[in-house]
């Protein structure tokens, strides 16, 4: 929208987007006179700041295009429409431009703005619908929505004749679809469902005509064909009558050139953004091949070929995809082509829309709306839903509306419509013509100023048209001067005010509708003075200080204080309680700073404020503390053991730096370590030093820490990592030793030298050894820096031969030192004799105890023993082995099968290998424990004594005989159980304390324990205990007579 130059300021300030708010800004003009006649509306928020303010209808929801299925059980259609406005809008509807009479036609009803259509009929209700929203401000029309009806009629029941062709000839089977709406999808059934025709280079189904094309018929094509159509909305399907396809018997069709039978239209219209599918298929023998090209330019890269190249598919079509496309069909007999034009259109889209506007009567309105589209849109204008016609005051040119000399009757709702042949879009706005007498909201006004300061007296009446403004003081008309100015916005500006400016100022506003006055009483007070002490103070970290702020001001005014640090408000509630605000009198305010930190240094401000004045006084706080971090460390030069470093001074925090400490870190060090320097010490005036006694070929980082009389500060950022130069190794391996190994081996081991002391690349070890009493050394190179062992084998070595051994180091720079000479013995031999007196005893059905004696002392002493055991019916290789942890001479074998004979042998072993096995001994495990649990548990309780009995358990033939019973007792909620043994099938228990106890019984045999009985739960009296706090047991005689009380038992299931 544009505005004439004569009124652009007023118009732009009062034009508002209906869906968003714009905020304007203005700059002051210090000219003493102003001719500006309008009061500006700052934003739409001002315009509609209250719910009570009236405004025209604004659509929240407009009707959308809809497709209704005639097969739907619910014959009701709802077209939605909703608008906001004040007063609340009322609604009506148009169908194809004609009003819908909801009172005369019972099929139509309105719920709020929604139109309900009952018993919908395609004949009556098909068309374009518009919603009309109306209130006292005006009328707006929605976009139009197309209502269509989806249906699919039946095929004609007429029998279709057979199609007879020669083999090799082409054929087109016609679908002749029934009436339908909207689009349908075609497919063909061959002979019977669900056998559908598969499309390939020899079969094509056109989605434009529905016909089936077969360029070269083969015997396998003979059969019955049925066309199936499917509605894309309702998913309804119908089948055509069958069309038989037969072969003639008068010969085979020869080759013939292609003939295009299915192709896209010569002109294809497509909306921007949709997917376009161009069809092209030909008959011919041999079967033709299809190729595509774009006549001007290349086919879009996004395009895809479908159905054996018979369909060119272009997704998300754009304007640049327009043009002529050609499909070509070729075979060995010739070729043919078809060419058509693809034209892409776009619906109108807004570039600029119209906005709500309010203007004074007599002014000029100029609205402009602009839209893009292909074809280019044309424009129409509506006022209150009716076409706006050109008059002497009204001009409409290319989307621009101009109304001269606005009148109150021009108020209302306006709509700009941009449309082309494919669609239309609407932009709505309200035009409000203002006409009111001046009015002031607040009257009178009391204003207080300070001597020597400027003061502004505002005059902002609400009026339309803009009123004329005049000022007077104490009933005398004010004349502008160098010190008193009337600004363009009607504000009275007084420069350098004094007590003589006090008085009553009256602003008078008047227009043709009336007048109003605003009285402002101006009082001028003496300025305020603020003293802050001390103005500059130095403290040390950890100390405290108090800043005192005193103010002198007019006693009739209240004063408030605000403390600032470096021009930012100070929050005394934060920062760990370092700040405390203290005010003992209305004119003083103190700030206490406790346990001062370096970050508390800076400029502190005390701002005193009254309703007329604001004064700031500032003081500087200097904090002495440890130095700040030095600048980043730079490595100037590096050698094998030194590094020359430089850095820059950090802040000294008001206490001179006395010394620097140089630190280094390497991948093998424990964090940062202080290093020796030259010079030593490094004084605070220096910015370089040499780190000495570094290890060669180690990657170091360096940093520097400064110290002053207050303390040590934070370290500098670390230097880049640098590696010292290589040097000959200087550290020999430690803890050289040896021994063990296999027969005829000499095993030498050592602790590896850490990377920190390898001093260069190519690090390795030199292992030197000789038999005691000989002169020459044998030397072997070990090239791995991580190696810890070297083995030397010589068949001539007797076991335990003593050797003198030493281990040295080397790297690419040369050989380093050797370790001290130590004596190392060669390996002894594997055991020569087997263990003797091997015995085995059955412990239970699953355990065997094995005992033996070690072989006679001598070379090849065992370091441990290996026991092998296997079933008598198995081979030894299938058995198991188990080793002792040391030189034990017994072992318990468990996890064995019951009542089974095993063979057991023992052999010794040491680091040299295994010795011979002993002779195998045979041993049988005991029979399995009884599988049946004790049954028929009965009990009698007298106090804390419980008499318990059960039926004896009888062992089966393959089970061990019962030799007694084990009674297990535990208190509920505890894991520990007490165990009692008895040879009888009855016991008397004295329970140790009150509570609930769980009792179960197991049979005991040589084969182990049997299955558990059902659990018995017994509740004893609280507080009753046995004398010694332990469970006491009395065995009952076998013939004891029982009077039994059965409990609720927890009975597990057992196999019989």
UniProtKB/Swiss-Prot annotation:
It is found in: Cell membrane. Glycans are attached at residues 96, 119, 355, 489, 496, 772, 887, 945, 958. Residues 1-33, 711-736 are annotated as: Disordered. This is Contactin-5. SMART domains: FN3 (SM00060), IG (SM00409), IGc2 (SM00408). It holds the Pfam family I-set. It is a lipid-anchor; GPI-anchor. Belongs to the immunoglobulin superfamily. Contactin family. GO terms for cellular component: neuron projection; plasma membrane; side of membrane. Residues 1-14 have a biased composition (Low complexity). A lipid is attached at residue 1035 (GPI-anchor amidated asparagine). Disulfide bonds join 81-131, 175-227, 280-327, 369-416, 459-507, 549-606. The gene is cntn5. Residues 1036-1056 form a propeptide. Its main location: membrane. Keywords: Cell adhesion, Cell membrane, Disulfide bond, Glycoprotein, GPI-anchor, Immunoglobulin domain, Lipoprotein, Membrane, Repeat, Signal. It comes from Danio rerio. Residues 629-727, 732-829, 834-928, 933-1023 form the Fibronectin type-III domain.
